[in-house]
C-alpha cells in the first residue's frame, strides 16, 4: 500500500501478539508498549539526515556522524499516545514533545479537540505523530491538521495498528504524511474498533473501561 510502511520485524510482531491477547495484564501491556515503541521508533527514524562532527576518542581525533538539523518532535495524541512516548524518548532523549488532545465522540465517531501544546519552530522540525491505533482516522486527521496550522511541514504518523478504513480516510486528507505501523488489520466493527485489534489501547494501558 503506497505511503504505508508495515514494520514486520520479528520482535515487533512477537510483542504485538502478546499485547493482543485479552489475558495480558495492564502491567504487561504497558511494559510491552514501551518495548515495542522503541523498536518502532528505530524504524521510523532510520533515514534521518546525518552530518559529521570532529571528536576526540581516547586514541585520536576523528570525524564522526551526528544527527543534523533541529531536534525531533514526538507529538502524542492524548491519552493513549503517551504510552508510546516513554520508549521513544529513551531512544531519542533530546526530542521535544507535543501533546494534542482530541477524543472520539462515540455517537458520531468524529474527533473533538480539547488541548494543543507544541514546541516552537515546529516548521523546522521533523514531527512524528504517535497514537497506538489508526481506526477511523478522525483523531489522527484532526491532530495533523492542527500541526499543519502551526506550520509543521515534515510529518510522519506512527501507530501500532491500522485499519484499512482509517488509512483511506487519513490519506484522503493528508496524502503527504507517510504512515508507519506494525500491522494493517482486517476492518472496523460497528463501534469503530479495529478487528481483530487489541481492544481499547488507552483502557488496557491504564486499567480503565
From Swiss-Prot:
Broad enzyme group: transferase
One of the protein's GO biological processes: uracil salvage
Annotated residues for binding of 5-phospho-alpha-D-ribose 1-diphosphate: 79, 104, 131-139, 200
Comment on bound cofactor: Binds 1 Mg(2+) ion per subunit. The magnesium is bound as Mg-PRPP.
MF terms (GO), sorted A to Z: GTP binding; magnesium ion binding; uracil phosphoribosyltransferase activity
Pathway participation: Pyrimidine metabolism; UMP biosynthesis via salvage pathway; UMP from uracil: step 1/1
Keywords tagged on the record: Allosteric enzyme, Glycosyltransferase, GTP-binding, Magnesium, Nucleotide-binding, Transferase
Pfam families: UPRTase
Matches recorded under InterPro entries: PRibTrfase_dom, PRTase-like, Upp_B, UPRTase/APRTase, Ura_phspho_trans
EC number from the UniProt entry: 2.4.2.9
Regulation acting on activity, per entry: Allosterically activated by GTP.
Positions of uracil binding: 194, 199-201
Reactions catalysed according to its record: UMP + diphosphate = 5-phospho-alpha-D-ribose 1-diphosphate + uracil
SUPFAM superfamilies tied to this protein: PRTase-like (SSF53271)
Entry cofactors: Mg(2+)
PANTHER family with a match to the protein in the record: ADENINE PHOSPHORIBOSYLTRANSFERASE, URACIL PHOSPHORIBOSYLTRANSFERASE, CHLOROPLASTIC
Function, as annotated: Catalyzes the conversion of uracil and 5-phospho-alpha-D-ribose 1-diphosphate (PRPP) to UMP and diphosphate.
Family to which this protein belongs: Belongs to the UPRTase family.
Record protein name field: Uracil phosphoribosyltransferase
Organism of origin: Sinorhizobium medicae (strain WSM419)
Gene: upp
Amino acid at each position: 500500500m503506497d505511503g504505508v510502511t508495515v514494520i514486520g520485524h520479528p520482535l515487533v510482531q512477537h510483542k504485538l501478539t502478546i499485547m493482543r491477547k485479552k489475558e495480558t495484564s495492564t502491567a504487561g501491556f504497558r511494559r510491552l508498549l514501551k518495548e515495542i515503541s522503541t523498536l518502532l521508533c528505530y524504524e521510523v527514524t532510520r533515514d534521518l539526515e546525518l552530518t559529521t562532527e570532529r571528536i576526540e576518542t581516547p586514541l585520536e581525533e576523528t570525524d564522526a556522524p551526528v544527527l543534523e538539523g533541529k531536534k525531533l518532535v514526538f507529538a502524542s495524541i492524548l491519552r493513549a499516545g503517551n504510552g508510546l512516548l516513554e520508549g521513544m524518548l529513551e531512544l531519542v532523549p533530546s526530542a521535544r514533545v507535543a501533546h494534542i488532545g482530541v477524543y472520539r465522540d462515540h455517537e458520531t465517531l468524529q474527533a473533538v479537540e480539547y488541548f494543543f501544546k507544541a514546541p516552537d519552530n515546529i516548521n523546522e522540525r521533523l514531527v512524528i505523530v504517535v497514537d497506538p491505533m489508526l481506526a477511523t482516522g478522525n483523531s489522527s486527521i484532526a491532530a495533523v491538521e492542527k500541526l499543519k496550522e502551526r506550520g509543521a511541514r515534515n510529518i510522519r504518523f506512527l501507530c501500532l495498528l491500522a485499519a484499512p478504513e482509517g488509512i483511506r480516510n487519513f490519506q484522503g486528507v493528508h496524502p503527504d504524511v507517510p504512515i508507519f505501523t506494525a500491522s494493517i488489520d482486517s476492518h472496523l466493527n460497528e463501534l469503530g474498533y479495529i478487528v481483530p485489534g487489541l481492544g481499547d489501547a488507552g483502557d488496557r494501558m491504564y486499567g480503565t473501561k
